[in-house]
């Protein structure tokens, strides 16, 4: 009887393991199927937009420049990162004029390609720069075997130091910078602005994370104790819902203007590319924008909120009263990824903001 029971239990466990493996295999196969389908959708819609754009007025500033980050990126082997650089009208080695560079910094789980639509609204005279942090986007693709020496390198402070080193490496000493950061990238931009001092002429913060709620802090504590494999499985299950997965819906508003399905599909693909280990390590070292003792630079600061953003809102501007700065607050009807939903509106906000405060030509 004893051996019979053990035999049945062993069989039950074996069938359970086989069943679990079967389900997991199905999930991965379906995930790959969705990825191919969404990639095809994104390409088809992009081709359609490019075809229609040929009939638009040449005076439409939204089509002054065509940008393809995935094809035109370069590698900085010293720091093992991929970057995109469009020099603009003034060569970067020009010593007779101060070069002004727009620097785009992506957020947690993001990549520089998320700025492509916004960048396309900038005229050819503007110098544009962005790069993917270690283990993100094209940097991960170009350096797949890179090992991070210390988790401190992936904290907000570590990524800020990396950003500063990359800028110092690629640009001359007289270069001036306009920093544009999204979400976590907004916090990094604010830290880098302090390192650049007077060389940072403007700071533009898109959907910044101002403060952590007690619920968010509890979630981070739980994730710290959760094995990466379980987090990856949760992400896989979430992606099973396709365009309605929570990782997509929490980042975008319900009523996206334009081709909403293409935007959702592209965001789903970017989320899939995000490495769980890198994402978790960055999250564990994530700082709030308004850290105690932090002081913003004296340059003009634009803080752009999304009306339907669950991460931050215009109401959060009350937190800035204890942090002196030359602020301009703006809200548009988007979710957390404002530059994906309404790139033209984000560009217009940047353009009008710089026109208001600038005494020089920003080439925008």
UniProtKB/Swiss-Prot annotation:
Q: What is its EC number?
A: 3.-.-.-
User: Endoplasmic reticulum: present as a keyword of the record?
Assistant: yes
Q: Which residues cross the membrane?
A: 9-29
**Classification via Pfam families:** Abhydrolase_1
Annotated GO molecular function terms are:
triacylglycerol lipase activity
Which keywords has UniProt assigned to this entry?
Answer: Endoplasmic reticulum, Glycoprotein, Hydrolase, Membrane, Signal-anchor, Transmembrane, Transmembrane helix
Q: What class of enzyme is it?
A: hydrolase
Q: Which InterPro entries match?
A: AB_hydrolase_1 (IPR000073), AB_hydrolase_fold (IPR029058), Carboxylesterase_BioH (IPR050228)
Please indicate the ranges of residues that lie on the Cytoplasmic side. 1-8
**Taxonomic superkingdom:** Eukaryota
Q: Which GO terms describe its cellular component?
A: endoplasmic reticulum; endoplasmic reticulum membrane; lipid droplet
For membrane topology, the record states:
Single-pass type II membrane protein
Q: Which GO terms describe its biological process?
A: triglyceride catabolic process
Membrane side Lumenal: residue ranges: 30-364
Cellular compartment(s): Endoplasmic reticulum membrane
Point out the glycosylated residues in this chain. Answer: 326
Q: Which residues form the active site?
A: 183, 336
**Homology family:** Belongs to the AB hydrolase superfamily.
The protein in question is named Abhydrolase domain-containing protein C57A10.08c
Give the source species: Schizosaccharomyces pombe (strain 972 / ATCC 24843)
């Amino acid at each position: 009887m004893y051996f019979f029971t053990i035999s049945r239990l062993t069989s039950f466990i074996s069938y359970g393991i086989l069943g679990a493996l079967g389900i997991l295999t199905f999930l991965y196969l379906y995930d790959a199927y969705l990825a191919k389908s969404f990639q095809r959708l994104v390409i088809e819609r992009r081709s359609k937009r490019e075809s229609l754009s040929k009939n638009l007025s040449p005076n439409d500033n939204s089509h002054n420049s065509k940008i393809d980050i995935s094809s035109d990126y370069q590698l900085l082997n010293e720091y093992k990162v991929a970057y995109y650089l469009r020099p603009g009208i003034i060569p970067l080695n020009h010593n007779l004029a101060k070069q002004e560079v727009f620097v785009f910094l992506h957020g947690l789980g993001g990549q520089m390609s998320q700025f492509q639509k916004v960048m396309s609204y900038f005229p050819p005279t503007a110098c544009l720069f962005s790069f993917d942090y270690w283990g993100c986007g094209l940097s991960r693709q170009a350096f797949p075997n890179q090992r991070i020496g210390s988790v401190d390198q992936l904290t907000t402070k570590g990524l800020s130091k990396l950003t500063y080193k990359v800028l110092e490496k690629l640009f001359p000493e007289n270069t001036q910078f306009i920093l544009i950061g999204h979400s976590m990238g907004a916090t990094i931009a604010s830290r880098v602005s302090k390192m650049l001092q007077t060389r940072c002429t403007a700071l533009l913060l898109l959907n910044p994370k101002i403060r952590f709620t007690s619920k968010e802090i509890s979630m981070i504590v739980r994730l710290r104790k959760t094995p990466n494999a379980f987090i990856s499985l949760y992400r896989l299950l979430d992606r099973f819902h396709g365009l309605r997965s929570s990782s997509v819906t929490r980042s975008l508003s319900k009523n996206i203007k334009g081709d909403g399905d293409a935007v959702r599909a592209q965001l789903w693909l970017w989320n899939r590319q995000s490495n769980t280990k890198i994402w978790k390590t960055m999250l564990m070292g994530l700082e709030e924008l308004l850290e105690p003792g932090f002081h913003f630079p004296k340059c003009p600061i634009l803080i752009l909120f999304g009306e339907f953003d669950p991460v931050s809102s215009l109401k959060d501007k009350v937190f800035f009263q204890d942090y002196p700065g030359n602020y301009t607050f703006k809200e548009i009807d988007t979710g957390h990824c404002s530059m994906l939903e309404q790139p033209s509106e984000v560009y217009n906000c940047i353009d009008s903001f710089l026109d208001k405060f600038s005494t020089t030509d920003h080439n925008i």
